[in-house]
C-alpha cells in the first residue's frame, strides 16, 4: 500500500480548444504509480456503496479510500486471490459484491471476507464462453458478461452461466462475438454493443434469446470500418449515445431504433473518431474519451477539447474509461497516463508562470500588478520586466530593457496607472513612465537632487494623489511627493532637523485613504499624516507600531481600506491589525492549527470578505462573521508564499496575487464549496502494529473491519490501533477526523491523521466513534461506530474472584479471634482522640486569652505612645534623658507591632474582618465582575449571560470583600464547567433581600459533599467527575466567601438543581438596619493621590488653592470648568492648566451645572463618581440644555471598567480619560479638543458650502443650526430681517442666540446673517445670469453700494471682479 499525502501531479491549465473559439481552463489532479497506483494504464473505474473507488489497471486491482491505495494482484499460491492481474472491467451488484473481469477469468469479490471467487471457461455448457471479460453489468438480479467469445448471463440462484453466441445465419443472434458494452435504459430495454454492431434484446425465453441488430447509415467521410461499439449511455431526455472505435459518436433518439452519426454536426467534425468511453457529468455535459484526449460536448452544443498529440502516451491523452462518482467529480483513466480527477473545485484557482500556456509570464517572481481601463493587466516581474496581458484578445507581450528603448530595469518593484501610462518603480534606477498605447518610455526630467535620491535607493511603492502628484516610497530615502507639472518635490525622512519625521526611511507601502490621510508603512513602524497639512511648515505625523526609545518598530508590509472605511495593516511576522479610532487592534488569523503572522497584501470582494496573501497561502476573512478559511497549495494555489502588495482586483470580479512562483487568479464568487461528506470507513485494525487478518488463529475479525460492528479482545490484545479514511477525493490531504473511545474518554480527538492508537488496561465495554470532515470542513452528521469488548485477565475473571472470596472468608474467620483485642485498641484510640480534642480546645482558649490580653494591652500602650511623642517634640532638657525617652518610644512601638501581628493572626483564624460598607449600585458592581470573565467565556465558547430585574439596586456592601466572593464563585463555575457550557449571573429581590445566583451547567457536586463544601480546606474529590482533570484549589475559597457573606449579615448556600450543574446563591439584606454605624463608611470612593501625577513633571506646579490672579480672566484664553470632589486633585489640575486657560472650579455636578449655565465655559472636565450629582448625569444635563449643549465634556474617573466608559459615552461625553492619566497626554488631549472647536468655527467662514453636522458636536445643536440656516434662507430677500426677528423665529432669547451663534461660528448674529447672504450672493454671481444690483436686493441688502463694500471685505475683490473671474472660466 502507498500513502497519498498530497496529490503529486497537477495537470494545470489544459487549454480547452473550442470550435467556437472559447477559452476555458480544466485542471486535473492525477495519480500515478508514484502515488501508489499499481500501474499507469487505467482500464476501468467503479465506486462501491460505501464510497471507495476501485481502479482496474493492466497490473492489479486498486482500492482507493481517499488516502491510501490498496492493491490486489494474482497470487498463484492463494486460490482466494484474483484470477489475473490484468483488469478489464469492474461492476458492483446490489448485494455489494464486486465483479471483476480480467484477461483470464471472472471474479466475484466479497468485501466482507476480502476474498475472490473465480469463474473460468470449461467444457461444461453452464460455464463461461471465454476467460477474457470485457464488460460487466447487473440487470434484473443477473450479471450480464461481455466476453471475447460472446455474451454470458450469470444466474445468482443457480450459479450457472447461459451463453449467447453470434451466428451469421441467424439474424436474431448477436451481430458480433466480441461483446464490448452492455446497457439497460430507463425503460428497461437492454442494449448490447459488439465489435460488429449494436443490438437490442427483443425477446427471451428458456430456450432462446433474440436480438435486433440496429442498422446505421455509414458516413461517407468515415473510412468503412465496421461499427465497433465501445460504450453506451443515456441522457436525461432518454436519448442513447453510442461511442464507437474509429466511427465516432452516434445517437439514438428516445423511442427510436435508428443510429444517427453525430459526426455530421458542424461543431463536432474535428472530434477524434476513435472514441473509447463516454459519460455525463452533473451538469449534463457529455465527456467523450478518445485516443487524442477528452472532448466535452456541452448542453448548448459547444465542444471543448482537452488533450495532447496522439503520439504522446503520457498524461491525459489515450482515454480508456470515464467515470462520474457520487460527488459529481469526473474520473478519466488513460493508457499509460494514469488516473485523472476533475472537479469544479480544481478550477477554483488558476495559476500562471513562465511555463503557462495561457498568460505566460516573462519571469516567475511577480512583485506588482496593475490594470488599465481597457482590459490590460500588467505584471511587474523582478527579473523579466513587465508582462502585459490583454483580456480581450487573450494575448501577452513582454516589455523589457531589450525590446523597449529607455526601459531602465527589468527588476520591477512597483506599477501604477496614471493617465493611460504606467509609472514603473524598479531596483536602483529612476522611476519612469511607460506609455502602453505608443509602447514607448516617456521622459521625465527629475531635478538632479531627486535623481540622486532615486539612484541611491530603489522605488518599492508608487501611489497616485492626483493626475499631477505622485508619491514614491523608496527603500532607504523615505517617501517622495513629486509634482509632475512643476517638478517640485517634498521628501519625508527620519532626519530630526528636517520638517518631517518618519519612523524609518525604508518605505514598503504607501496608501491614501478616503479621508485623505497618507499611510506610510516602513520597515520599522507605520506613519500617518493628513494631506490637508502637506503645505504647512510643520506637518504632524502620527506614528504606530514604533518604540521611539528603542528606535525600533514593526515591519509594515501593506495597508488597506475596506468598504466600511476601516484601515487594515498587514505586518511581517507580527500579525494583522485593524484601526479602531485611535489605536490598532490585532486580529487573530488562525484556522485548523495554521497561524498566519505575515500578511503581504489585502483585497476585498463583494461579499464582505477580505482576502489576505501570506506565507501560508491565501486567507478568506469574513468581516461580518469573522470566519476564516485558509487555501494553500493542496487547494490548487501555485505557492503558499506571496510578495508584498502584489495583488489586483480586476473589474471587481477577478483577483490576482503575485509571488515568487508566479501568479494565482480566481473569482471569489465562483469558488466551489465541497458539500459532499461521506461516512468514515474503517480501513484496518491492528494489534501491536500488525494487521489483524479475517479469520486467523484468534478469530478476532470474522469479516473486513469496514463491515465489522463489534470486536471481542482478550486482555493481552488491548494494545491496538484503528485506521480509517473518508472517501472524499477532493484535496483529500485536507480531510480531518474526530474520534473518541467512550468508556475511556468523552472529549473528541481532532486530527488529520488516519489512525487512532489505544492501550486499554481495564476490562469492559467500549465504543469507538469516528467522524470526518472533507477539505471544506463539512462534517459527517453521524459517526462510524465500533463496539469493543475487552475481557479480563484470568486472575481477574469471575472464577478467580470466587477463589479470592473463599480465601477472604477463611481469613475473616481467623480475624474473629482477635476482634476483642482490636475493640480494646479502638477504645484506647477514642480516648486519645478525646484528649487531643480537649488539648485543641485548651489551645484555642489560650489563643483567645492572648487575643483578649492584646486588646487590653493595646489601649494603654496607645495612650502611652501619644503623650510620649508629644513630650519628645516639646522636650528641651538634657540629652541623656532625651535618649532614654527615645529608647522608651522604640520599645513601645515594637511592642505595639507585636500586638498588631497577634491580632491579625487571630482575625485570619476566625475569619473576622472589619466591614467597611457603603451604599452603592450592586448591579453595576456585579456587572463589572461579570465583564472580567467575558473574554474567557468567549474563548471557551461558553454561553455566558447576565440577568437582573432592575438596572439599579442599592445595597450596603464592602466592595473589596464582596468582590472576592463573586470572583471566587464565577471562577469556580468556569473551572468546573466544560467548554461550550452555560454560566449565568442572575439578580432578583424581594422585600427584604437581594439574591445573586451563579448558575452553571458543569459537573455538579455529589450529595455526599454538599454539606462539607464550606468547611475550610475541604475540596470535592477529583473522582466526583472522573473524565475531567480539573485544576485543584486550596480549599479555602468557599469558606472565606461564607464568612464574608455572614459578615454582611447575609448567607451563601448551594441551591438544589434538577439538571447537571450547580447554583450558588448569595443573599444580602436590603437597607442598612442590619449594620452598625461603625461598619458603614460615608464615601465609597478611594481618594486620588496626586503624587502619581507630580512624578511625571520636571517642575511641580505650585499647589495654591485660590489666589487673586485666578479670579482675573483673560479674554484671549479659553475657559475650562473643572469638576472634581477630591480637592487636592482639583487644585492640581487647576494649576496644571491655569497658565494656558481661564479656570472655573466646582466640587460636585450640581454646582458645576449652575456655573456652566452662568459662565458658558469652552470645556468642562468632570469626574464621574461625585456626591450630589455624578459626572455622567452632569454630562447629560449639559448636552440636553440648549444653552450649554455646545460645550465639550471630558469625563475623568479612576474607574477603567468598560461599564463606566459605555455609560459616559452614552451620556454625550466628547472624551473619556481614565485615572491615573499621563500628564503630557492629558494636556495634549485638552488642547486638541479646543483647537478642533476653533477649526470648526473657522470652517464656517472659509467654506463656500457647509452642513450643520460639520460644525456642531451634539444633535441638539445640529437641529438648532439647521433651523437657523433655514430661517436665514427663508428671509434672504427680507431687508427688515434683524436679530430680534431671528431670535423670535428660532424660539430662543437674544442672549441665547448670541451665545449659540458665537459658539458655533465665532460670529455675532448680525455677522452670521450677513455671512450667509454674502455666500448666497457669491453663488448667484458664479452663474453670471443676474446683474449685481438685482443680486444685492435678492440677498437682503438695501443698497448695492453697501453690498459691494461688504462683498469686497469678505472676498477681497468687488462683485464685478468676482463675476468676471467666473465668466472667464466658462
Swiss-Prot record:
Domain Histidine kinase span(s) in chain numbering: 852-1072
Modification(s) after translation: Autophosphorylated. Activation requires a sequential transfer of a phosphate group from a His in the primary transmitter domain, to an Asp in the receiver domain and to a His in the secondary transmitter domain.
Domain named HTH araC/xylS-type: residues: 1266-1365
Domain Response regulatory: 1119-1234
An example Gene Ontology molecular-function term: DNA-binding transcription factor activity
InterPro entries associated with the record: CheY-like_superfamily (IPR011006), HATPase_C_sf (IPR036890), His_kinase_dom (IPR005467), HisK_dim/P_dom (IPR003661), HisK_dim/P_sf (IPR036097), Homeodomain-like_sf (IPR009057), HTH_AraC (IPR018060), HTH_AraC-typ_CS (IPR018062)
Stated name of the protein: Histidine kinase P4
Subcellular localization, as worded in the UniProt entry: Membrane; Cell surface
Modified residues (4-aspartylphosphate): 1167
DNA-binding region: 1284-1305, 1332-1355
Transmembrane segments: 799-819
Catalytic reaction equation(s): ATP + protein L-histidine = ADP + protein N-phospho-L-histidine
Keywords carried by this UniProt record: DNA-binding, Kinase, Membrane, Phosphoprotein, Signal, Transcription, Transcription regulation, Transferase, Transmembrane, Transmembrane helix
Role this protein plays: Histidine kinase probably involved in ulvan degradation. Ulvan is the main polysaccharide component of the Ulvales (green seaweed) cell wall. It is composed of disaccharide building blocks comprising 3-sulfated rhamnose (Rha3S) linked to D-glucuronic acid (GlcA), L-iduronic acid (IduA), or D-xylose (Xyl).
One annotated Gene Ontology cellular component of this protein: cell surface
PANTHER family: HYBRID SIGNAL TRANSDUCTION HISTIDINE KINASE C, TWO-COMPONENT HISTIDINE KINASE
Its membrane topology: Single-pass membrane protein
Species per Swiss-Prot/TrEMBL record: Formosa agariphila (strain DSM 15362 / KCTC 12365 / LMG 23005 / KMM 3901 / M-2Alg 35-1)
Primary site of residence: membrane
PROSITE patterns: HIS_KIN (PS50109), HTH_ARAC_FAMILY_1 (PS00041), HTH_ARAC_FAMILY_2 (PS01124), RESPONSE_REGULATORY (PS50110)
Gene3D superfamilies: 1.10.287.130, 3.40.50.2300, Histidine kinase-like ATPase, C-terminal domain (3.30.565.10), Homeodomain-like (1.10.10.60), Immunoglobulins (2.60.40.10), YVTN repeat-like/Quinoprotein amine dehydrogenase (2.130.10.10)
Enzyme Commission (EC) number: 2.7.13.3
Record PTM Phosphohistidine, positions in chain: 855
